[in-house]
A protein has these predicted regions:
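Active-site-proximal beta-alpha core segment in soluble small-molecule metabolic enzymes
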Residues: 1-155
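Active-site anion/phosphate-binding pocket segments in diverse small-molecule metabolic enzymes
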Residues: 19-20, 39, 57-64, 130-351
């Protein structure tokens, strides 16, 4: 996905961890990368070596970063961005300590103040968002008034973008929107945006069996057949990101119709009751869609999120690395990536 965004003209990328940033560098991404969450000061050398910007969100972390970079005065400059606390309550420098932090970064050897950012708590709450934007502008404006070159300022993410109300400043950080998805709480409120989902989740059965009435399905069991039933076993379980909370609460699409997923979700499998699917009996060559569209039927990430009492972010980001990714361009499959980098050992479930 990053390569596609790179080719489309993204100015840079934000990630959560240094490992993710390194993975992008090793994949050939040369544009700026910012790690949003704290890194241990002892690995600051690796960030400097790979030209990866890091975030300082509190005094202890900043002091550690400055000490680590000061010990290597001849190494490449480490870019640091400050997280500002504007109301999320998760981290960042507030109005009382932001100036000292920015001043220390600006005057330290081997370090450059490259930006400041915050994160909006509830983009759909106009009053709360306005207060956070005002706090951010006030803190960053005070730094500029006192002679600090703040660098790139950014606070808007997917929610602001799809509402058409993004305070872009010097950049925006679309996350869920890069999947073509609208944040759950903004469904129905989003401005026209041309987004369409680009992620779908598919599986083919590894077994389809006719079972008698009274058969318990999966561990527990939490589901027992009340009639002779045809049950398909799909090779997708909670180790793949299909949460156990979806047990007996989700559906799949097959041949353009909905079928219930029955029994407790196992580590590596979930079962579908295909007894009522019309036509020839469902077999191992039938394709099931767990997220996405088949014919006129659709199961969205938000549908799955509602079934497991979470949000779409958790649904799409917890699909495990062992689920093969099939990348498309203009609706044509172009590349399949697995844990071993190609189609060797490919499983029957895919995203």
């Amino acid at each position: 996905m990053t390569r596609a965004l790179d080719a489309a003209g993204a100015d840079g990328f934000c990630v959560a961890t240094l490992d993710e940033a390194i993975a992008l560098r090793e994949a050939g991404i040369e544009k700026p990368i910012l790690v949003l969450f704290p890194i241990p000061p002892e690995v600051a050398r690796e960030a400097r070596r790979r030209s990866i910007a890091v975030t300082a969100s509190d005094r202890r972390l900043l002091d550690g970063l400055l000490a680590a970079t000061g010990a290597e005065p001849d190494a490449p400059v480490l870019e640091v961005q400050l997280e500002l606390e504007t109301g999320l309550g998760r981290g960042g420098f507030g109005a009382g300590d932001a100036w000292q932090a920015a001043s220390d970064v600006s005057s330290a050897p081997g370090v450059r103040l490259a930006g400041a950012w915050t994160h909006l708590q509830a983009p759909g709450d106009d009053g709360r968002t306005a207060a956070q934007v005002a706090a951010f502008e006030r803190i960053s404006g005070d730094l500029a008034a006192r002679g600090i070159a703040v660098g790139r300022r950014h606070l808007a993410a997917s929610g602001s973008l799809v509402l058409g109300e993004a305070v872009s400043l010097d950049g925006v950080r679309p996350g869920l929107a890069t999947y073509g998805l609208v944040p759950d709480e903004l469904l129905g409120r989003a401005a026209p945006n041309g987004l369409r989902p680009v992620l779908s989740l598919h599986a083919r059965p590894v077994r389809v069996a006719d079972l008698p009435a009274g058969t318990g399905i999966s561990y527990g069991p939490s589901f027992t057949t009340a009639r002779p039933s045809r049950i398909a076993t799909l090779p997708l379980g909670y180790a793949d990101g299909w949460a156990r909370a979806l047990s007996n609460r989700a559906e799949a699409l097959v041949r353009g119709g909905r079928v219930p997923l029955v029994g407790n979700v196992a580590m590596d499998a979930v079962m579908a009751d295909v007894t009522d699917v019309p036509g020839e009996p469902v077999g191992v060559h039938d394709e099931f869609v767990l997220i996405g569209q088949q014919g006129d039927a659709v199961i969205t990430a938000a549908d799955v999120a509602a079934a497991r009492d979470t949000n779409s972010w958790e649904v799409v980001t917890t699909i495990a690395a062992r689920v093969p990714r099939v990348y498309h361009a203009a609706s044509v499959p172009r590349e399949t990536r697995t844990l071993v980098g190609d189609e060797v050992g490919r499983r029957s479930a895919r995203a």
